[in-house]
């Protein structure tokens, strides 16, 4: 590594938290520190040699109790770029299916001298429970419909690269808000940065408490698009729906699907985002997802740098790592 890179990382402050459980536990300085660190790691992963020895001899376990493609691979790649030893856990092949509790499962894994745990779980609050009950650094990779902090961090980071400082910028979140951990984490992150936030979707998919957070609500997508600088499109989370929240997918597409025809009606270019997985032809057409307005693949790329930054900063604070 170049000496300038080492000095940049070494002089950085510490996060205010010992775990990453949710954006709601972070402050504005934490966000800026994570983004600045991600800038440094983005330079690293664009070099021919993409690894740094920062987390050598640190072991990280990835515990995913829900399906994941982007997040799981992104965390694993980030950990390996930092030279950590990585364990990948699959709940479908574990003793959880034999009735073992989450705490017992994690404590057994930690007895193998694991230092950090990245967890995705269907139960809201599972990462916080672990942080209180086990002796390891915990990173929340998504807990039910509660939070998905690293997704919100990479989303804000990607927005800033496109439109600069988010203060007073108009950010729109469209779709299934009520079941989305991405939406809630994004709202917390955007509020810390002084952005104006509006959500759009059927009333049945928008939680009423958002208005108490100062979030504006719009049920007309065309009006919302005219207002926004960025539109973050969310999929319908059918796996979390026990009731009928809208008449049909066809009806949903008609009123809330993002098409090029809709974008052509407004007199400005807006940035299009999506956390994935995309249901093409439902919340967004392929033409829009693959257009010059879209930064969906940039979000995925930035996810590695953001997760490297989060992992590194927590290790720096908790294990006295500075290289």
Regions from the PLM with identified roles:
Residues 10-73:
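Positively charged, low-complexity intrinsically disordered leader regions
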Residues 49-157, 280:
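Phosphate/diphosphate ligand-binding glycine-rich loop within oxidoreductases
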Residues 55-60, 167-169, 269:
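Phosphate-coordination loops involved in phosphoryl transfer and adenosine-cofactor binding
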Residues 65-66, 70-76, 161-234:
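Glycine-rich phosphate/diphosphate-binding loop of Rossmann-like nucleotide-binding domains
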Residues 82, 113, 133-135, 193, ...:
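Short, structured coil segments at secondary-structure junctions
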Residues 269-270, 275-323:
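Adenosine-phosphate binding glycine-rich loop
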